[in-house]
A protein has these predicted regions:
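ATP-dependent carboxylate-amine ligase
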Residues: 2-143
Length: 143
């Protein structure tokens, strides 16, 4: 248990990136069970959450599983939630049905730019994370 608590990053997951004053912590969720687990990891003290979903072949193009995820873990007074990604509109509908008002942005980088400076929790599915990491690495001079 002590070893697990000391893990800070695994293949980009849980990594923190400073993007123009926004400290974005990245979390990857690839299936309903992963999304449920990610919901428990959202820091309750953070006022901004970006959730991104793409629908490419590696993600699975059928996003009906969104309705199996309990998104209530991100819902709290004063928190801003931004849905994004290729299937951001589908995600926004799902969040609204869960009672979570959200804004909509085309891409995770756009969603992050729409946030106020400070901490931001960023939950993304596989290709949304992959594409976002490419942009982050470029911005940080890693690629």
């Amino acid at each position: 248990a002590a070893a697990v608590s000391s893990v800070t990053e695994v293949a980009g997951r849980y990594s923190v990136h400073d993007v123009n004053g926004r400290k974005a912590r990245l979390m990857l969720a690839k299936n309903p069970a992963g999304w449920q687990e990610a919901m428990t990891m959202v820091d309750p003290r953070v006022d901004q959450v970006v959730i991104g979903v793409n629908g490419q072949v590696p993600d699975g193009q059928d996003l009906s599983w969104l309705w199996d995820v309990d998104f209530s873990g991100v819902n709290r007074p004063g928190r801003r939630v931004i849905a994004c990604g290729e299937r951001g509109a589908d995600l926004a509908v799902r969040l609204e049905y869960a009672g979570i008002h959200c804004d909509l942005a085309p891409l995770p980088m756009d969603a992050l730019a729409a946030c106020e400076p400070g901490r931001v929790e960023v939950l993304l599915n596989y290709t949304a994370m992959r594409d976002f990491k490419v942009l982050l690495d470029r911005k940080e001079g890693k690629r």
